[in-house]
Swiss-Prot record:
ATP binds at G36, Y37, S38, G39, A40, G41, K42, S43. GO terms for cellular component: plasma membrane. It comes from the Bacteria. Part of the ABC transporter complex MetNIQ involved in methionine import. Responsible for energy coupling to the transport system. It comes from Helicobacter pylori (strain J99 / ATCC 700824). The lineage of its organism: Bacteria, Pseudomonadati, Campylobacterota, Epsilonproteobacteria, Campylobacterales. This is Methionine import ATP-binding protein MetN.
Length: 327
């Protein structure tokens, strides 16, 4: 495991219980989206991973080492394998792009002869080789975040922490940053923890996700699994799943989830031909995830109880998720 959080509790001096019994693992090469509402404990969680904050109790293991047991110099060395980017970039306004990236190498005591080539390599990686002498005030928000990404990769980390790294950006720039991070992850086989309140970020970038609410992890799994079958009420809210059809007169209203292999199949047509029922489609949409697409239909079944039951058994036999929206 690249990251292991064990029985983490975080209680501030004012008595606020920010994290409660948190256990979390991150495997090599995984991109974990941590999502939740404001104040849920997301930023506290990510700051514990590199010990910017220390837990009240529990263990923080990164690359197999409990960071809480390290002396200051040992912790500083361990942090070189942990890159971090922030919502507001945290660039030094008095230094140009080259100097901002070089600063991370200087702190790590790189040889001066190697710093120049490494900085140019990083700036080429993030598409800013033509902005070497620009200062932060001359850059757009997306360009500033690219500088921050280059700086975070300076010491060749195997773990990248992203704290709301796209929430200050517009949707087009967010997409470009996520595309960049995805390419970097594949190139260097990085593990990434991405804190966000934007469900679109999880859909576009992550293969794993966890949902945090009031300091507790309430749901954890692959993005595909959770989008297909969310269990916790907070997860359903974040995914935009609401029982908006509760006022419909018919009781036989269902939500059907189609995974990638079923999206192109005429399942509803087959259902009508096989069974003595009519199917009214109320709503539908498709979510494009990093692993596969997932489709959703909200339908009303019209027919006898026995025929509707047979139709439901048929859908279940196909491996589809079927949820009754009204009893």
């Amino acid at each position: 495991m690249v990251v292991e959080l064990k029985n983490i509790e975080k209680i501030y001096e004012n008595g606020f219980h920010a994290l409660k019994g948190v256990n979390l693992e991150l495997k090599k090469g995984d991109i974990l989206g941590v999502i939740g509402y404001s104040g849920a404990g997301k930023s506290t969680l990510i700051r514990l991973i590199n010990c910017l904050e220390r837990p009240s109790s529990g263990e923080v293991l990164v690359n197999g080492v409990n960071l809480l047991n390290l002396k200051p110099k040992e912790l500083q060395k361990a942090r070189q394998k942990i890159g971090m980017i922030f919502q507001h970039f945290n660039l030094l306004s008095a230094k140009n792009v080259f100097e901002n990236v070089a600063f991370a190498l200087e702190i790590a005591r790189w040889e001066k002869t190697k710093i120049k080539s490494r900085v140019h390599e990083l700036l080429e990686l993030v598409g800013l080789e033509d902005k070497v002498h620009f200062y932060p005030k001359q850059l757009s928000g997306g360009q500033k975040q690219r500088v921050a990404i280059a700086r975070s990769l300076a010491n060749c980390p195997n773990l990248l922490l992203c704290d709301e790294a796209t929430s200050a950006l517009d949707s087009k720039t967010t997409h470009s940053i996520l595309t960049l991070l995805s390419g970097i992850q594949k190139k260097f086989d990085l593990s990434i923890v991405f804190i966000t309140h934007q469900i679109e970020v999880v859909k576009e970038l992550c293969n794993q996700m966890c949902v945090i609410s009031s300091g507790e992890i309430v749901e954890r799994g692959s993005v595909e699994e959770i989008f297909a079958n969310p269990k916790h009420a907070v997860t359903k809210e974040l995914l935009g799943i609401k029982n908006e059809h509760a006022d419909q007169k018919s009781q036989d209203i269902y939500r059907i989830v189609f995974l990638g292999e079923h999206l192109d199949e005429p399942i509803i047509s087959n259902l009508i031909r096989r069974f003595k029922i009519d199917v009214s489609i109320i709503s539908g949409n498709i979510e494009e995830l990093t692993t596969k697409d997932i489709g959703y239909l909200v339908v009303r079944f019209l027919g006898s109880v026995a025929e509707i039951q047979r139709a439901l058994e048929y859908l279940n036999a196909l491996g589809l998720q079927v949820e009754k929206l009204k009893d």
